Curated annotation (Swiss-Prot):
Nucleoside triphosphate pyrophosphatase. May have a dual role in cell division arrest and in preventing the incorporation of modified nucleotides into cellular nucleic acids. This is Nucleoside triphosphate pyrophosphatase. One of its GO terms (molecular function) is nucleoside triphosphate diphosphatase activity. Its cofactor is a divalent metal cation. Pfam families: Maf. GO terms for cellular component: cytoplasm. It catalyses: a ribonucleoside 5'-triphosphate + H2O = a ribonucleoside 5'-phosphate + diphosphate + H(+); a 2'-deoxyribonucleoside 5'-triphosphate + H2O = a 2'-deoxyribonucleoside 5'-phosphate + diphosphate + H(+). Its main location: cytoplasm. Gene3D superfamilies: 3.90.950.10. Keywords: Cytoplasm, Hydrolase, Nucleotide metabolism.
Length: 194
């Protein structure tokens, strides 16, 4: 059971041949992030808490089921970024990230009967190139509303790759799910054939 509405996460699981169903948890992520900001500036901890909260909420509706929750945080220069609400927000985010290195931290949590049974957090570092504003406007025109579907206003697996100079870290983590670690856990627990 996947406690996420992310099409990227669902696509990764499908392409890996993992059977699952989706049940999206109703979580006010902004409220959680706001309250956590006062407690910690650790994006890995916030991603883990959000992932667990989603999985626990869905687990309550599915007794006995293994529920996977995931979340991702983007931080740059001690600032947390969210999915942009519109083109203007996407443009502002990309300008703030231009010619800088930012970190994407992805957390995945497994919950059964309301209890966390496993978790994993992984981070990747991405450096954007010093693109021109002319390029940026063309990118936003071509990408369209897709820029609103992911934190950072890009999809590295597509057109967004043109924004980058270098990437350090696991590709699946960048897409929002540390898939290799998750599959290892699923094999160890009899959910996948070893």
């Amino acid at each position: 059971m996947l406690a996420s509405g992310s099409t990227a996460r669902a696509r990764m699981l499908e392409q890996a041949g993992i059977a699952f169903t989706v049940d999206v948890a109703a979580v006010d992520e902004e409220a959680v992030k706001h309250s956590m900001a006062a407690e910690t500036r650790n994006p890995a901890r916030v991603a883990e808490i959000l992932a667990e909260l989603k999985a626990v909420r869905v687990s309550a509706r599915h007794p006995g089921a293994l529920v996977i929750g995931a979340d991702q945080m983007l931080d740059c220069d001690n600032v947390w970024f969210d999915k942009p609400a519109d083109r203007q927000g996407a443009r502002a985010q990309l300008l703030a990230l231009r010619h800088k290195t930012h970190r994407l931290t992805s957390a995945v949590v497994a919950v059964r009967d309301g209890r966390r049974v496993w978790h994993h957090t992984e981070a990747a570092k991405l450096t954007m190139r010093n693109f021109s504003e002319n390029f940026l406007d063309g990118y936003l025109d071509q990408a369209g509303e897709a820029v609103q579907t992911s934190v950072g206003a890009y999809q590295l697996e597509g057109l967004g790759s043109q924004l980058f100079l270098s990437v350090e870290g696991d590709f699946f983590t960048i897409l929002g799910l540390p898939l290799l670690a998750l599959m290892d856990f699923l094999r160890e627990n009899g959910e996948l054939v070893p």
